[in-house]
Amino acid sequence: MSENTSTATQPTPLLQDTFTVGSRTFSSRLLVGTGKYKDMTETGAAIGASAAEIVTVAIRRTNIGQNSNEPNLLDVISPDKYTILPNTAGCFDAETAIRTCKLARELLGGHNLVKLEVLGDEKTLYPNVMETLKAAKVLIDDGFEVMVYTSDDPIVAQELESMGCVAIMPLGSLIGSGLGLINRHTLSLIIENTKVPVLVDAGVGTASDAAIAMELGCDGVLMNSAIANAKNPVMMAQAMKHAVWAGRQAFLAGRMPMRKMATASSPQTGYFFQ
């Protein structure tokens, strides 16, 4: 969705560079997950270091009040400080995903912003597009603001947008793979043809992947494994914060044209010795 405003007459101060998802506006374009950390302390420290404002939580795998006998993640990630984004990780059909979103809304006191993901199989965790479309329609009709994990197919992205999804979240590569952005061309097509925010979801492995996503014009990047599986998750969270910031600034600045041949940087006239 991002518009390149990289002109001298229309500067965009980065500190005012917000983006809107549904009815909410955010400053940080880095979204983070809560899984795979060694304990709650590390979870809180890494998320704090990331400066993320949106934190996604797998409702089927994380206790946010369902079980009073287990530690509650919300004691570490307070809804007063962060926007909690419930997700439907682990759902393989529309019905289960819909039910999970309704449970999240109940647990979070009417919260209606959700991340929909309906998976195709356990080996690839690739999105099941047909079930995703089915679930998205029901959830939108029920008043949810749906951010949707999907394939990098521009036509599917257009369909999800036309249904009313508030953000399109194509995968960069397989969930947890760390392979980076495999198909930048189709991601660019989605960005160019989508009016709602586009956020890369899945596949980011290191800071350069996040920067590239932002340089392409993505509105944000969501990640979990890249931070949680790093040797030093807190340091990696800081690196990702800076990478997303730098990539966004580079996009707004506008990169130089790519050329096949060399172009001298120094003047071609006025040499001291001729």
Swiss-Prot record:
Gene Ontology CC annotation, any one: cytoplasm
Q: What is a GO molecular function of this protein?
A: thiazole synthase activity
Instruction: Give the binding site residues for 1-deoxy-D-xylulose 5-phosphate.
Output: 176, 202-203, 224-225
Task: List this protein's GO terms for biological process.
Answer: thiamine diphosphate biosynthetic process
Entry-linked InterPro entries: Aldolase_TIM (IPR013785), Thiazole_synthase_ThiG (IPR033983), ThiG (IPR008867)
**Main localisation, per the record?**
cytoplasm
Q: Where in the cell is it found?
A: Cytoplasm
Q: Which UniProt keywords apply?
A: Cytoplasm, Schiff base, Thiamine biosynthesis, Transferase
* SUPFAM superfamilies hit by this protein: ThiG-like
Please explain the role this protein plays, according to its UniProt record. Answer: Catalyzes the rearrangement of 1-deoxy-D-xylulose 5-phosphate (DXP) to produce the thiazole phosphate moiety of thiamine. Sulfur is provided by the thiocarboxylate moiety of the carrier protein ThiS. In vitro, sulfur can be provided by H(2)S.
Q: What is its EC number?
A: 2.8.1.10
Q: Which residues form the active site?
A: 115
Q: Which reactions are catalysed by this chain?
A: [ThiS sulfur-carrier protein]-C-terminal-Gly-aminoethanethioate + 2-iminoacetate + 1-deoxy-D-xylulose 5-phosphate = [ThiS sulfur-carrier protein]-C-terminal Gly-Gly + 2-[(2R,5Z)-2-carboxy-4-methylthiazol-5(2H)-ylidene]ethyl phosphate + 2 H2O + H(+)
Q: What quaternary structure, including any partners, is listed in this protein's UniProt entry?
A: Homotetramer. Forms heterodimers with either ThiH or ThiS.
Which species does this protein come from?
A: Psychrobacter arcticus (strain DSM 17307 / VKM B-2377 / 273-4)
Question: What family does the entry list?
Answer: Belongs to the ThiG family.
The pathway it acts in is: Cofactor biosynthesis; thiamine diphosphate biosynthesis
Q: Which gene encodes it?
A: thiG
Q: Please give the name of this protein.
A: Thiazole synthase
